Amino acid sequence: MCDTKDDAQKWKCETCTYENYPSSLKCTMCQASKPLLNEDIFRLSPAQESCTVAEEAAAVEVAVMSPTPSSTCYSLQPQSQARQSNVADSEKWPCKVCTYLNWPRSLRCVQCCTKRGGEAIERGKKDMDNEADGDRAGEALQALRISGSEENLANKPVQLIGATASHRLSLSRGIDDATHLNNLANASHNQSQSQHRQPVLQQQMQLQLQPQQQRESSSSAAVPPQQQKQCYVSKWACNSCTYENWPRSIKCSMCGKTREREISGSQNDLHASSSLNSQEENQQQLQQPNVDTVSVNNSFNKKHIYQLGSSETINNCDTLQERQERRQRQIRRQVDWQWLNACLGVVENNYSAVEAYLSCGGNPARSLTSTEIAALNRNSAFDVGHTLIHLAIRFHREEMLPMLLDQISGSGPGIKRVPSYVAPDLAADIRRHFANTLRLRKSGLPCHYVQKHATFALPAEIEELPIPIQEQLYDELLDRDAQKQLETPPPALNWSLEITARLSSRMFVLWNRSAGDCLLDSAMQATWGVFDRDNILRRALADTLHQCGHVFFTRWKEYEMLQASMLHFTLEDSQFEEDWSTLLSLAGQPGSSLEQLHIFALAHILRRPIIVYGVKYVKSFRGEDIGYARFEGVYLPLFWDQNFCTKSPIALGYTRGHFSALVPMEPFTRIDGRRDDVEDVTYLPLMDCELKLLPIHFLTQSEVGNEESMMRQWLDVCVTDGGLLVAQQKLSKRPLLVAQMLEEWLNHYRRIAQVITAPFIRRPQITHYSSDGDSDEE
């Protein structure tokens, strides 16, 4: 218990009623400020000054020696000891602001808190925060044994390390706050006097500052560099699990992996260099003459708190994020960047990147994996399993699709080898010949039309190939998925055994490009057996709709109004105009999908009916019905005269947004050149599997109900023995260019068949005779 003689002069705390010593500016129990209402602001006697300075020195000594200031009582030094060390007034230094004479060891003015030879320090609300931060930092430093052992603290009580320096600073700031209030009243009165004494005071300050700076440098130099080096915890990170291990650990504490010497050595060198740099910085600070003890220790404390904080941050770092970054770096080193650059080239429309990948023998059918998508780091643009063709279709790269599709020319599963790929020169000649057959009707309907008719069919010579070769041919020619989907119950194709078997009119689904040009490709395949790669048919379609728009718009609008009334809703004229402009723009854009109106216009360009067999419902990826397809039916060239058109139709198939050409197989008797029949006939059903007539599209209100009679007018209709209404498709002689293309295509498979079926010729065994006669007998 602290004893004192003047218990009657103690002041009572207004918060906790604890009686504090007169020199205490804050309550020892609750840290509440001392009430200053009863103080005399003009009391500036020498006795009070000496007492104040003595009390300040005692408070500083208590702050330095006590480890926890809140747990012990502040034992003040007796005032008699302070009076014994009185110094003459000539040795005191006056404050340049308030002219108060301060003791030589005081670094700041007791009255106005002005720094000795500098400006007033900041005061305010940060005192409590600094004190609390100092306590926490002091505990952390003591826990890590940064400030040394207890014996060192006992032998060197002047060392100001960690929380003691910050706590002493907070106490001095608390004393300065109280004295600053007393100075506000007479600051203006003393300001004029201080101006006259300024030159004399500056000389005294320079003389008194030299011994003070020596004491400050000696006190700050008491902190050895060994203690500074101990502040940095140099743990090493495991390369496998990223666990932070202690420096002396040979193996990882988590996974048991041996520490790599090269990495650890580099880390130790790094920590050693950082510690040496910190020692050099401390030596430079100690050599500077104008640095006070408080600022040196505060900077020392803050620096080591930052180092400890950084080590704690390393120990508690987000290991998941580091593992992901490390995994991405490994992926970037292992993946094929030429392939990934090609994928990015399709997305970013970089033609050269795709061309560079294909020129080096890259496979256009290669699909993306999850690892490669992680390396690309663009999940919104790429999906697992996507190829360059998928990306080109998704991002509408119409100029890249022909190049990618041309690369699909090898053999193997999923690789297509259509006749136009085997004989590209002949296919180009066929497209050029077709372009020359297009004409424009000048009188009447200004519509493009073809001058010659052709119908494509698979050659009968396929039956002469071996069965394995036939299977390979069909795999590389047909679209098996579309064929299966059209024949799946309820079937839309080859559902009548009478038509397929007895009448030999089975239809095959040809593969074509999976793009928005599939309708035009299928129309060209059904007639000439090639793709519309030069967009000849698309340009003719766009020109026809623009030049004959007034004729097509009237019938299209009436048909759409009729379909809307069947679904019990109506459309406004503005909606019709908007939809019509959309249809016109789609016709002129290569790669864009086409609608029913475009099939109706194609029937006029080809001058023949078009029969579409398709699914009735559009399904999602999960197999759920999401809407009506409405493409199945008969499209007649109603704007032409019947005598101007042929009655031999072509057949197309529709499956979930994709059109395919439906072609028959030529009868085997066609190979015989002595036959009398010039044309072969294929029978196309005009009824569905439920024996209902196929709808005729774009009929007016007056024409509805006369579907069968209109079919008989525009088609060669007959009825089978089973009562099915069918249309006759005439197969005439092949055009010369088409025959040459098919012959070259068949020769490819004939060569494969010869290699497989050729007999194995064994080499004759040659007998070698020795020159020795005895060995010959043996």
Swiss-Prot record:
A zinc finger (RanBP2-type) spans 5-36, 89-118, 232-261. Keywords: Hydrolase, Metal-binding, Phosphoprotein, Protease, Repeat, Thiol protease, Ubl conjugation pathway, Wnt signaling pathway, Zinc, Zinc-finger. One of its GO terms (molecular function) is K63-linked deubiquitinase activity. Residues 187-226, 265-290 are annotated as: Disordered. Residues 187-197 have a biased composition (Polar residues). InterPro entries: AnkUBD, OTU_Deubiquitinase, OTU_dom, Znf_RanBP2, Znf_RanBP2_sf, ZRANB1_OTU. It comes from the Eukaryota. Residues 507-665 form the OTU domain. SUPFAM superfamilies: Ran binding protein zinc finger-like. It is an enzyme of class 3 (hydrolase). The keyword Metal-binding applies. Disulfide bonds: none annotated. Its EC number is 3.4.19.12. One of its GO terms (cellular component) is nucleus. Interacts with Apc. Belongs to the peptidase C64 family. PANTHER family: UBIQUITIN THIOESTERASE (PTHR13367), UBIQUITIN THIOESTERASE ZRANB1 (PTHR13367:SF28). The OTU domain mediates the deubiquitinating activity. This is Ubiquitin thioesterase trabid.
